[in-house]
Protein backbone atom coordinates (compact mmCIF):
# COMPACT_ATOMS: atom_id res chain seq x y z
CA UNK A 1 0.00 0.00 0.00
CA UNK A 2 3.04 2.30 0.25
CA UNK A 3 2.77 2.81 -3.52
CA UNK A 4 -0.57 4.52 -2.87
CA UNK A 5 1.16 7.02 -0.56
CA UNK A 6 2.22 9.95 -2.73
CA UNK A 7 4.85 12.39 -1.45
CA UNK A 8 4.40 15.94 -2.74
CA UNK A 9 7.73 17.37 -3.89
CA UNK A 10 6.66 20.98 -3.34
CA UNK A 11 10.12 22.43 -3.83
CA UNK A 12 11.31 25.38 -5.95
CA UNK A 13 14.05 23.49 -7.78
CA UNK A 14 16.03 20.31 -8.39
CA UNK A 15 18.67 21.06 -5.76
CA UNK A 16 16.04 20.94 -3.01
CA UNK A 17 14.63 17.71 -4.44
CA UNK A 18 18.07 16.09 -4.48
CA UNK A 19 18.69 17.12 -0.88
CA UNK A 20 15.31 15.75 0.22
CA UNK A 21 15.71 12.44 -1.63
CA UNK A 22 19.04 11.76 0.08
CA UNK A 23 16.93 10.69 3.05
CA UNK A 24 15.34 7.97 0.91
CA UNK A 25 18.25 6.10 -0.66
CA UNK A 26 16.99 2.65 -1.68
CA UNK A 27 13.32 3.64 -1.36
CA UNK A 28 11.09 3.64 -4.41
CA UNK A 29 8.62 6.46 -3.82
CA UNK A 30 5.49 7.66 -5.55
CA UNK A 31 6.09 11.41 -5.82
CA UNK A 32 4.01 14.38 -6.94
CA UNK A 33 5.59 17.02 -9.15
CA UNK A 34 3.54 20.21 -9.21
CA UNK A 35 3.56 23.44 -11.15
CA UNK A 36 6.34 25.20 -9.23
CA UNK A 37 8.91 22.45 -9.73
CA UNK A 38 7.91 21.47 -13.27
CA UNK A 39 7.78 25.05 -14.55
CA UNK A 40 11.27 25.67 -13.11
CA UNK A 41 12.98 22.46 -14.18
CA UNK A 42 10.88 21.21 -17.10
CA UNK A 43 10.83 17.61 -18.34
CA UNK A 44 14.40 17.08 -17.07
CA UNK A 45 13.08 16.70 -13.51
CA UNK A 46 10.82 13.87 -14.68
CA UNK A 47 13.76 12.11 -16.33
CA UNK A 48 15.83 12.52 -13.16
CA UNK A 49 13.11 11.06 -10.92
CA UNK A 50 12.44 8.17 -13.28
CA UNK A 51 16.15 7.32 -13.33
CA UNK A 52 15.94 7.14 -9.52
CA UNK A 53 13.15 4.57 -9.85
CA UNK A 54 10.28 6.71 -8.56
CA UNK A 55 6.69 6.76 -9.82
CA UNK A 56 5.38 10.22 -10.71
CA UNK A 57 2.09 12.06 -10.40
CA UNK A 58 2.49 15.13 -12.61
CA UNK A 59 0.08 17.59 -11.03
CA UNK A 60 -0.50 20.36 -13.59
CA UNK A 61 -4.33 20.53 -13.41
CA UNK A 62 -4.86 21.23 -17.10
CA UNK A 63 -7.89 23.38 -17.97
CA UNK A 64 -8.15 24.68 -21.53
CA UNK A 65 -9.98 24.07 -24.79
CA UNK A 66 -10.18 20.36 -25.76
CA UNK A 67 -7.64 20.47 -28.60
CA UNK A 68 -5.02 22.20 -26.45
CA UNK A 69 -5.49 19.72 -23.61
CA UNK A 70 -5.29 16.79 -26.02
CA UNK A 71 -1.99 18.03 -27.43
CA UNK A 72 -0.59 18.73 -23.97
CA UNK A 73 -1.54 15.27 -22.71
CA UNK A 74 0.08 13.67 -25.74
CA UNK A 75 3.32 15.37 -24.71
CA UNK A 76 2.97 14.49 -21.02
CA UNK A 77 2.31 10.81 -21.77
CA UNK A 78 5.57 10.65 -23.72
CA UNK A 79 7.40 11.54 -20.48
CA UNK A 80 6.35 8.15 -19.00
CA UNK A 81 4.67 9.69 -15.94
CA UNK A 82 2.27 7.49 -13.98
CA UNK A 83 -0.56 9.89 -13.17
CA UNK A 84 -1.81 13.22 -14.56
CA UNK A 85 -4.80 15.46 -13.93
CA UNK A 86 -7.19 18.04 -15.33
CA UNK A 87 -9.88 20.29 -13.87
CA UNK A 88 -13.31 18.63 -14.09
CA UNK A 89 -14.77 22.11 -14.65
CA UNK A 90 -13.28 21.94 -18.15
CA UNK A 91 -16.19 19.68 -19.08
CA UNK A 92 -16.90 16.43 -20.87
CA UNK A 93 -15.29 17.26 -24.23
CA UNK A 94 -12.08 18.48 -22.63
CA UNK A 95 -11.76 15.39 -20.42
CA UNK A 96 -12.40 13.02 -23.32
CA UNK A 97 -9.75 14.89 -25.31
CA UNK A 98 -7.30 14.41 -22.43
CA UNK A 99 -7.73 10.63 -22.62
CA UNK A 100 -7.31 10.69 -26.41
CA UNK A 101 -4.06 12.60 -26.04
CA UNK A 102 -2.73 10.20 -23.42
CA UNK A 103 -3.53 7.18 -25.59
CA UNK A 104 -1.75 8.75 -28.55
CA UNK A 105 1.31 9.76 -26.55
CA UNK A 106 1.89 6.74 -24.30
CA UNK A 107 5.14 4.86 -24.68
CA UNK A 108 5.02 1.68 -26.76
CA UNK A 109 4.04 -1.38 -24.74
CA UNK A 110 2.94 0.66 -21.71
CA UNK A 111 -0.43 1.59 -20.28
CA UNK A 112 -1.44 5.24 -20.48
CA UNK A 113 -1.01 7.25 -17.26
CA UNK A 114 -3.85 7.25 -14.75
CA UNK A 115 -5.93 10.34 -15.47
CA UNK A 116 -7.91 12.03 -12.72
CA UNK A 117 -9.87 15.27 -12.43
CA UNK A 118 -9.83 17.94 -9.74
CA UNK A 119 -13.34 18.47 -8.34
CA UNK A 120 -12.79 21.29 -5.84
CA UNK A 121 -9.44 22.30 -4.36
CA UNK A 122 -8.97 21.36 -0.71
CA UNK A 123 -8.43 25.06 -0.01
CA UNK A 124 -12.04 25.72 -1.07
CA UNK A 125 -14.70 26.08 1.61
CA UNK A 126 -18.41 25.86 0.86
CA UNK A 127 -18.83 29.56 1.61
CA UNK A 128 -16.05 30.44 -0.85
CA UNK A 129 -17.51 28.15 -3.51
CA UNK A 130 -20.91 29.83 -3.28
CA UNK A 131 -19.78 33.43 -2.87
CA UNK A 132 -16.71 33.57 -5.13
CA UNK A 133 -17.14 30.75 -7.65
CA UNK A 134 -20.90 31.10 -7.98
CA UNK A 135 -21.88 27.45 -7.42
CA UNK A 136 -25.06 27.24 -5.35
CA UNK A 137 -24.87 23.52 -4.59
CA UNK A 138 -23.46 22.20 -1.33
CA UNK A 139 -19.78 21.29 -1.53
CA UNK A 140 -20.64 17.58 -1.43
CA UNK A 141 -23.20 17.99 -4.22
CA UNK A 142 -20.76 19.93 -6.40
CA UNK A 143 -18.01 17.35 -5.92
CA UNK A 144 -20.41 14.46 -6.66
CA UNK A 145 -21.61 16.23 -9.83
CA UNK A 146 -18.05 16.69 -11.09
CA UNK A 147 -17.17 13.09 -10.16
CA UNK A 148 -20.09 11.71 -12.20
CA UNK A 149 -19.07 13.89 -15.14
CA UNK A 150 -15.49 12.65 -14.79
CA UNK A 151 -16.55 9.00 -14.85
CA UNK A 152 -18.85 9.57 -17.85
CA UNK A 153 -15.91 11.16 -19.67
CA UNK A 154 -13.80 8.01 -19.28
CA UNK A 155 -11.31 9.22 -16.67
CA UNK A 156 -10.08 6.95 -13.89
CA UNK A 157 -11.07 9.03 -10.88
CA UNK A 158 -10.85 12.36 -9.10
CA UNK A 159 -8.87 14.46 -6.69
CA UNK A 160 -11.09 15.19 -3.70
CA UNK A 161 -10.95 15.59 0.05
CA UNK A 162 -11.29 12.55 2.30
CA UNK A 163 -14.64 13.90 3.48
CA UNK A 164 -16.16 13.35 0.04
CA UNK A 165 -14.83 9.81 -0.53
CA UNK A 166 -17.79 7.87 0.96
CA UNK A 167 -20.29 9.81 -1.18
CA UNK A 168 -18.21 9.26 -4.31
CA UNK A 169 -18.03 5.53 -3.61
CA UNK A 170 -21.85 5.56 -3.63
CA UNK A 171 -22.10 7.64 -6.79
CA UNK A 172 -19.25 6.20 -8.88
CA UNK A 173 -18.53 2.73 -7.44
CA UNK A 174 -15.58 1.12 -5.66
CA UNK A 175 -13.38 0.98 -8.77
CA UNK A 176 -13.38 4.76 -9.12
CA UNK A 177 -10.03 6.20 -7.99
CA UNK A 178 -10.01 8.84 -5.24
CA UNK A 179 -6.78 10.75 -4.69
CA UNK A 180 -6.91 12.78 -1.49
CA UNK A 181 -4.53 15.63 -0.63
CA UNK A 182 -4.88 17.66 2.55
CA UNK A 183 -3.36 14.86 4.63
CA UNK A 184 -1.68 15.87 7.88
CA UNK A 185 -0.40 14.11 10.97
CA UNK A 186 -2.48 15.03 14.00
CA UNK A 187 0.34 17.18 15.41
CA UNK A 188 0.77 19.31 12.25
CA UNK A 189 -0.62 22.71 11.25
CA UNK A 190 -3.27 22.63 8.50
CA UNK A 191 -1.68 25.67 6.78
CA UNK A 192 -3.73 26.85 3.75
CA UNK A 193 -5.92 23.79 3.34
CA UNK A 194 -9.45 23.71 4.74
CA UNK A 195 -10.63 20.11 4.29
CA UNK A 196 -7.89 18.00 5.91
CA UNK A 197 -7.58 14.56 7.53
CA UNK A 198 -5.02 12.22 9.08
CA UNK A 199 -3.69 9.18 7.17
CA UNK A 200 -5.68 6.90 9.49
CA UNK A 201 -8.90 8.78 8.78
CA UNK A 202 -8.24 8.69 5.03
CA UNK A 203 -7.88 4.90 5.22
CA UNK A 204 -11.10 4.58 7.23
CA UNK A 205 -13.01 6.70 4.71
CA UNK A 206 -11.73 4.65 1.76
CA UNK A 207 -9.25 6.85 -0.12
CA UNK A 208 -7.41 5.10 -2.97
CA UNK A 209 -4.31 7.32 -2.72
CA UNK A 210 -3.21 9.97 -0.25
CA UNK A 211 -0.95 12.92 -1.04
CA UNK A 212 1.28 14.10 1.80
CA UNK A 213 3.56 17.13 1.56
CA UNK A 214 4.69 19.26 4.46
CA UNK A 215 4.17 16.57 7.11
CA UNK A 216 7.06 14.74 5.42
CA UNK A 217 9.02 17.35 3.48
CA UNK A 218 9.23 19.84 6.37
CA UNK A 219 9.87 17.23 9.05
CA UNK A 220 13.13 17.25 11.01
CA UNK A 221 13.58 13.62 9.94
CA UNK A 222 11.71 13.11 6.65
CA UNK A 223 12.30 9.34 6.50
CA UNK A 224 10.88 8.80 9.99
CA UNK A 225 7.91 11.04 9.16
CA UNK A 226 7.34 9.04 5.97
CA UNK A 227 7.39 5.78 7.94
CA UNK A 228 4.93 7.21 10.48
CA UNK A 229 2.52 8.30 7.75
CA UNK A 230 2.91 4.95 5.99
CA UNK A 231 2.17 3.03 9.20
CA UNK A 232 -0.96 5.07 9.88
CA UNK A 233 -2.09 4.74 6.26
CA UNK A 234 -1.56 0.99 6.21
CA UNK A 235 -3.05 0.46 9.67
CA UNK A 236 0.16 -0.95 11.11
CA UNK A 237 0.44 -0.93 14.91
CA UNK A 238 3.97 -0.48 16.25
UniProtKB/Swiss-Prot annotation:
Residues annotated for substrate binding in this entry: 10, 32, 59-68, 122, 184, 193, 213-214
Gene Ontology terms: cellular component: cytosol
Keyword Lyase included in the entry's annotation: yes
InterPro entries (alphabetical): Aldolase_TIM, OMPdecase, OMPdecase_AS, OMPdecase_bac, OMPdeCOase_dom, RibuloseP-bd_barrel
Role according to the record: Catalyzes the decarboxylation of orotidine 5'-monophosphate (OMP) to uridine 5'-monophosphate (UMP).
Subunit: Homodimer.
Family assignment from sequence similarity: Belongs to the OMP decarboxylase family. Type 1 subfamily.
Annotated protein name in UniProt: Orotidine 5'-phosphate decarboxylase
Gene source species: Bacillus cereus (strain Q1)
Gene, per the UniProt record: pyrF
Amino acid sequence: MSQSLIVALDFPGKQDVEQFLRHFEGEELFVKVGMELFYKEGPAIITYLKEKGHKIFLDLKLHDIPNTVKSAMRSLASLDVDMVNVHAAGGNSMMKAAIEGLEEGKQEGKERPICIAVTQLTSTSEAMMKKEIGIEKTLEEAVAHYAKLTKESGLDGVVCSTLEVPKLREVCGDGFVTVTPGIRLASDDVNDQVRVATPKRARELGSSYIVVGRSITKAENPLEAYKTVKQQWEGVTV
